[in-house]
A protein has these predicted regions:
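DNA polymerase sliding clamps and clamp-related checkpoint/processivity subunits
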Residues: 2-32, 38-166, 172-188
Length: 188
């Protein structure tokens, strides 16, 4: 008799808080505008995402702490390559009364479930997303001293960028007594 024990590495993340499910959706809405694909590093402290725009000008990083999720389970650190546009389309199917569950076993496929909150009725939507192999190494993000600190709500910044992107792909931010956002492109 041959006895084989397979170790299935699993990860399950759940968001049930309405505000957090909306924030999670906005994260991928904005990521898809910066990068085509990202690699999620799932570890005991949370999820870490680092990426770069196609022109290799903008390096970004994002960390969602484990305690930010309503449920955070994982067996071992995982690296999940995700296509930003596709995950955004899936999460965008979420209705206001739905929770989000992300789950994978052995990092082969990402299962996204959008299901009604407790006490709510509705349809459960299940999606299976093929993960992609991203051959990248984490870059060291240097500490930088900035001449100006700007605090703005992420939704306000997203709205500004969306509105200015209508006029072109360039965005300049001028800091002085006032902060000025200027969008420009081929037409002006």
């Amino acid at each position: 008799i041959l006895n084989i024990n397979l170790l299935l590495l699993t990860m399950e993340l759940v968001l049930t808080n309405k505000q957090k499910t909306n924030q999670f959706s906005h994260i991928f809405k904005n990521l898809k505008n910066i990068s085509t694909d990202v690699e999620m590093h799932v570890k005991d402290t949370g999820i870490y995402i680092q990426g770069m725009d196609p022109g290799h000008i903008c390096l970004f990083e994002l960390e969602l702490k484990a305690y930010w999720f309503d449920e955070y389970k994982f067996d071992s650190p995982l690296r999940l390559g995700i296509h930003c546009e596709l995950i955004h389309k899936i999460i965008n199917c979420k209705e206001e009364h739905q929770n989000i569950r992300l789950k994978t076993t052995n990092g082969e496929k990402l299962h996204v479930t959008l299901y009604p909150r407790e006490g709510q009725s509705g349809i459960t939507k299940e999606f299976e997303l093929s993960l992609i192999d991203i051959d990248s190494e984490l870059l060291e993000v240097p500490e930088v001293e900035y001449d100006a600190d700007i605090e703005i709500a992420s939704q306000d910044l997203a709205n500004l960028i969306t509105q200015l992107s209508v006029f072109g792909k360039d965005l300049n931010i001028k800091c002085g007594e006032n902060v000025v956002f200027k969008g420009s492109g081929e037409l002006g």
